[in-house]
Swiss-Prot record:
It comes from the Bacteria. Its EC number is 2.7.7.6. It comes from Pseudomonas fluorescens (strain SBW25). This is DNA-directed RNA polymerase subunit beta'. It catalyses: RNA(n) + a ribonucleoside 5'-triphosphate = RNA(n+1) + diphosphate. The keyword Cytoplasm does not apply. Its cofactor is Mg(2+); Zn(2+). One of its GO terms (cellular component) is DNA-directed RNA polymerase complex. The RNAP catalytic core consists of 2 alpha, 1 beta, 1 beta' and 1 omega subunit. When a sigma factor is associated with the core the holoenzyme is formed, which can initiate transcription. NCBIfam families: rpoC_TIGR. It is an enzyme of class 2 (transferase).
């Protein structure tokens, strides 16, 4: 027995390891793995089913088929363990060894490994400096390659075809060596002297000038250094020995009827063995060259197919025309080893069933069917039955359970007590898709789910199914209870708002309960306390909606933990007083003294959580739910056709619109308007009519007439069922009601254009056949869109998770002072997101001063909570620098201070939180709600007149931001910069709105002026671009000759003459190179200089400019010299929704991106080329001018002689994130990407915290490009990990050497995932072959830092509770203790870590 125990112990021994290295296998290594050579292609004997000797399933090589029994049956039983049978040669062992023991095949001729040959860039090609095409010609026996030229005129590596080879033979005889096939390639690889080559390349690179050549050489150099550093030899890329997979991993299973099911690999191996044996025989017989060659080529092809079928030529197919699955196919793709078996395993102790609603459950409970519980908890029940002595053996216990004896149910109830189970609903889009509950046994077969967690699961009860999992170990139960219990997940990790929010019936009930009605029974009564209200209501003396006065005692908690009790009389309704009974102590009565709509309820729960804490909130949420259900039942709200009240005005509105349409039609018929104008007008008309109808309808629905208690008829908010549902937020919206009771409105064709005739009917009236047909388009497109959207959104989430999976909080504070400047987010002049909301839950990076003083009011390092937000708003601070994941300086991972608040818990984030995955889930989860389509700006939207003025919405004080301006004689300011902005601040100094001011805008207010709402503070002409003078003087024309460079036009209406500059291509030959300009001179005729420079003040005029001043005219500061007409902006498609988010995260360069100034300086135009303009920027510091060629059709925002700053827009268009990063830096990039992504989500009403987007951005900015290598081993132009470069630079700095210089690089998420340090993570993401090839050649080490790598190797992940385990293991290793870590030690370490992080 003791022997057996020892044996079992030995089986499970696993060496502890800290990294995994991948490399090339040498022939010796392959032979050392092997237990024998496979010589025959036979598999098993088809009569006896015994494996053939020396075949692919040979028991002598791979081990016995049955446990502890040799093949011939001479030795059986455990006592013969390790004996080798002398008859059949089989070792007596466990049959499991057939999964582990490998064999090999000695190849008669070397074979190139297809991965290193064909996976681009071809590694063999790079090393030998030959093209892939040439190598293939050698490998597949089409040409000879010279290996050793000897004393001849041939060169090493030269290709010879048959004729050339025979000519050379005749000429030189045996003086040279030229061969073909893989052995030739192997010889050449073997002959490479890595050290010598590396030295040669390092010398050659600095001496070459051509960019492409340097690129090629540095690629070779990198590969050679990789080979040198990894200990791989180049010739190992050519195989001489082929390893054979253990037979149980490629099984052969007999089916009934004498047929066999087999793995494809067996076919591929058989093919290789057959060809190899045939080749050996041919070589022994010394057959003619041509036959041997053919056989070698076939062997090469067979091995290619085994390693990666279909990579070269046509894939080898089986009997059923299906390509065979090769070794490479086994590991890649969704069904491959990585994604199917290592990252996604099926688990034991789980079940699934349909869900149904459990309105009587508490929040931490779920209803589990008895039958399911019995099956899931079987082992626990067996154990308990045996422990109780109710069953003598496990077998007896099993029988008892099968018979379902009464005592079994008692035991089950006991086993289940306090044993949480996990409920999961697919698709699990975020971490709230799996939560823990305490099971309650129920009859029936459906799982009961608490209604409030439906929002988190996105579940409904129309047939959804959910899976149940049982956490078995004590640690698992502990984590389920402490971390995953539904009561611990009240806030959403995406935005920190409650996710346990009542919806639908509950909202309706609470809304109905808190509405007020005029002249209800009991109106005007006064009650002494809440209990009295309750009694009177139950007695039926007062109606639920009656307006009454009640004396209340309330205890209000303030933010500092104190509380104030006071008594007052409030005007309220009976229902609200009843609702206040379930509100926890500490909240004021005002929270319920209003109609409880969905938003109000959400706010109430949030406030409750912040003020009175988790436990009270959970109890309160449950109470709210019970109350809501009760009162929505009492209310009897239901919908009948009569609730859809159609407004009386509808017929008249539609009649009027129809008449107008007829009028437009007749105009079109008589040719007064074009087809396009007619279409636009008609569509405008109908959308206006639709709005009017819906306005009338809502006005009609929302009010009803009642008699008050003085007998007067008054209006009150309606109790129409449909209106109440929409108003409370329970179900439906104004848009849907409009279709039911108003008119359906305009419909779109499948191509997105709008059909001119709207559907004037609504659903109550019913649609005609034509109307129904028109409306099917939209419905169909909607369904098709949804199907596509789900797949796209899932893929986006997968890429996000992959790029961010290894980002974990690893330390408390990285000590950086850097951060992002936060300002309110402004859109179209309005503040969409105030500063307070953006900094909530962030840590302040630098002290915040009281505006205008030196007094610090918020010290650096403060975690901003709701209390601080109010404080910041009160002190009218409008910009704060906060810590951000992007600027965090932690090496591996991120620090808690830079991340700030853990949104799902409401306090500073704990060490070990997997913030990367949370960010990915928060961004990916709402993906299915985003739209898929690109919006065409056309129809109503494109004709909105271009903005030509700034009109203030709120009154306040004017503030001008980085605005360069000149003051005109009349005191108005004229903007002479492009980046100026005008903001309006309120009395507290908080910014309320902000507007961009274009060049040439005339501003009628000054800094600090007070303005009223509605005032127009700036004006400009949107259709022309003015050239404004910045000084006074006299105008002189330069190079303006009529008929050659300019033409005069007279305006018919005004009779004024304008001078227009001719386009260069319309000028006669004499005027081609003349550049017309307007020069400023003083009264003596001397040239004036631009203020502050020594540049002559002359304004060059581009083509089509209109000059408005006469030669010799006197002008003042701020006058307009000329105007350049601007073609109205072309309508372009705006990519919205999911594709836009994907584009931003993939950092794609947009088409026709905006052009930014590369340097700060003065603009000039150089010589034009065909179709392009040459823009020259001369820097002010006297360095070399920067030139750029810009296509002529691009509209430029700048003109000659103007000053621009680095990164300013020269030509409009969508921004390119790479340009922003290069020219304006990381924080400008962060601001751009965060705002752009938020705009997309905001449009759908989805809230995501900025820090999640920043977290993903941090991962996209991991790489840097080396600009100067200094004394480091980096090569210029290399892309390296930022942390890696910083570590190296620290080392160089310490040794007083030159450090390397680098620029930051932005990678798209797919590229970033593939270029991680961990090859396991990258290989399991995409492009498995390429990643593994590269990793093997460079001998990469994976240090298992991320989550994915650890899941793949089957460890705890280094996040959450697993982080404690890993750090404890590391500490042990450093202390050289024995390496088994027990649960209790981890527990102790975890407690210590939690205490130190201040929890």
């Amino acid at each position: 027995m003791k022997d057996l125990l020892n044996l079992l112990k030995n089986q499970g021994q696993v060496e502890e390891f800290d990294a995994i290295r991948i490399g090339l296998a040498s022939p010796e290594m392959i032979r050392s793995w092997s237990f024998g050579e496979v010589k025959k292609p036979e598999t098993i004997n088809y009569r006896t089913f015994k494996p053939e000797r020396d075949g692919l399933f040979c028991a002598k090589i791979f081990g016995p088929v049955k446990d502890y029994e040799c093949l011939c049956g001479k030795y059986k039983r455990l006592k013969h363990r390790g004996v080798i049978c002398e008859k059949c040669g089989v070792e007596v062992a466990l049959a499991k060894v057939r999964r582990e023991r490998m064999a090999h095949i000695e190849l008669a001729s070397p074979v190139a490994h297809i991965w290193f040959l064909k996976s681009l860039p071809s590694r063999i090609g790079l090393l030998m400096d030959m093209t892939l095409r040439d190598i293939e010609r050698v490998l597949y026996f089409e040409s000879y390659v010279v290996i050793d030229p000897g004393m001849t005129t041939l060169e090493k590596g030269q290709l010879l075809n048959d004729e050339q080879y025979f000519e050379a033979l005749e000429e030189f005889g045996d003086d040279f060596d030229a061969r073909m096939g893989a052995e030739a390639v192997r010889e050449l690889l073997h002959a490479i002297d890595l050290e010598h080559e590396i030295g040669r390349l390092r010398e050659e690179i600095p001496q070459t000038n051509s960019e492409t050549k340097i690129k090629k050489l540095s690629k070779r150099l990198k590969l050679m250094e990789a080979f040198q550093g990894s200990g791989n030899l180049p010739e190992w890329m050519v195989l001489t020995v082929l390893p054979v997979l253990p037979p149980d991993l490629r099984p052969l299973v007999p089916l009934d009827g004498g047929r066999f099911a087999t793995s494809d690999l067996n076919d591929l191996y058989r093919r290789v063995i057959n060809r190899n044996n045939r080749l050996k025989r041919l070589l022994d017989l010394s057959a003619p060259d041509i036959i041997v060659r053919n056989e070698k080529r076939m062997l090469q092809e067979a091995v290619d197919a085994l390693l990666d079928n279909g990579r070269r030529g046509r894939a080898i197919t089986g009997s059923n025309k299906r390509p065979l699955k090769s070794l490479a196919d086994m590991i890649k793709g969704k069904q491959g080893r990585f994604r199917q078996n290592l990252l996604g395993k099926r688990v034991d102790y789980s079940g699934r069933s349909v869900i149904t609603v459990g309105p009587t459950l508490r929040l931490h409970q779920c209803g589990l069917p008895k039958k399911m519980a019995l099956e899931l908890f079987k082992p626990f029940i067996f154990g308990k039955l045996e422990m109780r002595g109710l069953a003598t053996t496990i077998k007896a216990a099993k029988k008892m359970v099968e018979r379902e004896l009464p005592e079994v149910w008692d035991v089950l109830a006991e086993v289940i007590r306090e044993h949480p189970v996990l409920l999961n609903r697919a698709p699990t889009l975020h971490r709230l898709g799996i939560q823990a509950f305490e099971p309650v046994l129920i009859e029936g077969k459906a799982i009961q789910l608490h209604p409030l967690v439906c929002a988190a699961y996105n579940a409904d009860f129309d047939g959804d199914q959910m899976a149940v999992h049982v956490p078995l170990t004590l640690e698992a139960q502990l984590e389920a209870r402490a971390l995953m219990m539904s009561t611990n997940n009240i806030l959403s990790p995406a935005n920190g708002e409650p996710i346990i929010v009542p919806s639908q019936d509950v909202v309706l009930g609470l809304y109905y309960m808190t509405r007020e009605a005029i002249n209800a029974k009991g109106e005007g009564r006064v009650f002494a306390d809440l209990q009295e209200v309750d009694r009177v209501f139950r007695a039926g003396e007062a109606a639920l909606h009656a307006k009454v006065k009640v004396r209340i005692n309330e205890t209000v908690n303030d933010r500092d933990g104190g509380s104030v009790t006071n008594t007052r009389i409030v005007d309220t309704t009976v229902g609200r007083a009843l609702l206040y009974q379930v509100v926890p102590k500490g909240l004021s009565y005002d929270v319920v003294n209003l109609p409880m709509k969905k938003k109000a309820i959400s706010k109430l729960i949030n406030q409750c959580y912040r003020v009175v804490g988790l436990k009270e909130t959970v109890i309160f949420a449950d109470q709210l739910m019970y109350t809501g259900f009760a009162y929505s039942t009492i209310s009897g709200v239901s919908i009948g056709v009569n609730d859809f009240v159609i407004p009386d005005e509808k017929a008249q509105i539609i009649g009027a619109a129809t008449d107008e349409v007829k009028e437009i039609e007749s105009q079109y018929a008589s040719g007064l308007v074009t087809q396009g104008e007619k279409y636009n007008k008609v569509i405008d008309l109908w959308s206006k009519a639709n709005d009017e109808v819906s306005k009338a309808m809502m006005a009609n629905l929302s009010k009803e007439k009642v008699i008050d208690r003085h007998g007067v008829e008054v209006d009150q908010e309606s109790f129409n069922s449909m209106y109440m549902m929409a108003d409370s937020g329970a179900r439906g919206s104004a848009a849907q009601i409009r279709q039911l009771a108003g008119m359906r409105g305009l419909m779109a064709k499948p191509d997105g254009s709008i059909i001119e005739t709207p559907i004037t009917a609504n659903f109550r009236e019913g649609l005609s056949v034509l109307q129904y047909f028109i409306s099917t388009h939209g419905a169909r497109k909607g369904l098709a869109d949804t199907a596509l959207k789900t797949a796209n959104s899932g893929y986006l989430t997968r890429r996000l998770v992959d790029v961010a999976q290894d980002l974990v909080v690893t330390e408390v504070d990285c000590g950086t002072e850097h951060g992002l400047l936060m300002t309110p987010h402004i859109e179209g002049g309005d503040v969409v997101e105030p500063l307070g909301e953006r900094v909530l839950g962030r840590v302040i990076a630098r002290d915040v001063f009281k505006p205008g003083t030196e007094e610090i009011i918020v010290p650096a390092g403060t975690l901003v909570d709701e209390k601080w937000v109010e404080f910041i708003e009160l002190n009218s601070i409008d910009e704060v620098i906060v810590r951000s994941p992007i600027s965090c300086e932690t090496r591996y991972g991120i620090c808690a201070k830079c991340y700030g608040r853990d949104l799902a818990r409401g306090h500073q984030v704990n060490i070990g939180e997997a913030v990367g995955v949370i960010a990915a889930q928060s961004i990916g989860e709402p993906g299915t709600q985003l739209t898929m389509r690109t919006f065409h700006i056309g129809g109503a939207a494109s004709r909105t007149s271009a903005a030509d003025s700034v009109q203030v919405k709120n009154g306040g004080t004017v503030r001008l931001h980085n605005l360069k301006h000149v003051e005109r004689v009349d005191g108005h300011l004229v903007a002479v910069s492009r980046s100026g902005e005008l903001a309006i601040a309120d009395d507290y100094g908080r910014e309320r709105e902000r507007y961009k001011l274009p060049y040439g805008a005339v501003i009628s207010v000054k800094e600090g002026d007070k303005v009223d709402a509605g005032a127009i503070v700036a004006k400009w002409d949107p259709h022309t671009h003015p050239i404004v003078t910045e000084m006074k003087g006299t105008v002189t024309y330069v190079g303006m000759e009529e008929g050659i460079t300019i033409k005069r036009q007279t305006d018919e209406l005004t009779g004024m003459t304008n001078i227009e500059v001719l386009d260069a291509k319309d000028r006669p030959a004499a005027g081609k190179d003349i550049r017309p300009a307007v020069k400023m001179v003083d009264d003596n005729g001397k040239d004036l200089l631009l203020p502050g420079t020594d540049v002559i003040a002359q304004y060059f005029l581009p083509a089509n400019a209109l000059v408005g001043v006469a030669d010799g005219a006197k002008i003042a500061i701020g006058d307009v010299i000329a105007r350049i007409p601007q073609e109205t902006s072309k309508t372009r498609d705006i990519t919205g929704g999911l594709p836009r988010v994907a584009d931003l995260f993939e950092a794609r360069r947009p088409k026709e991106a905006s052009i930014l100034a590369e340097v700060s300086g003065t603009i000039a135009f150089g010589k034009e080329t065909k179709g392009k303009r040459r823009l020259v920027i001369t820097p002010n510091d006297g360095s070399d001018p920067y030139e750029e060629l810009i296509p002529k059709w691009r509209h430029l925002n700048v003109f000659e002689g103007e000053q621009v700053n680095r990164g300013e827009v020269i030509s409009d268009g969508p921004s390119d994130p790479h340009d922003i990063l290069r020219l304006l830096g990381v924080s400008a990039l962060a601001k751009y990407i965060v705002n752009e992504i938020q705009d997309v989500y905001r449009l759908q009403g989805v809230k995501i915290n900025d820090k999640h987007i920043e977290t993903i951005l941090r991962q996209m900015l991991r790489k840097v490009e080396i600009a100067e290598s200094g004394d480091s081993s980096f090569i210029k132009g290399d892309q390296m990990e930022l942390t890696h470069v910083l570590v190296e630079n620290e080392r160089l700095g310490a040794e007083d050497k030159f450090v390397s210089k680098f620029t930051r690089v932005l990678l798209g998420i797919t590229k970033a995932s593939l270029s991680t340090e961990s090859f396991i993570s990258a290989a399991s993401f995409q492009e498995t072959t390429r990643v593994l090839t590269e990793a093997a050649v460079t001998g990469k080490r994976d240090y298992l830092r991320g989550l994915k790598e650890n899941v793949v190797v089957g460890r705890l992940i280094p996040a959450g509770t697993g982080l404690a385990y890993h750090s404890e293991r590391k500490r042990r290793r450093d202390a050289d203790k024995p390496l088994r870590v027990s649960a209790s030690e981890v527990e102790a370490a975890l407690t210590e870590a939690l205490n130190s992080s201040g929890n």
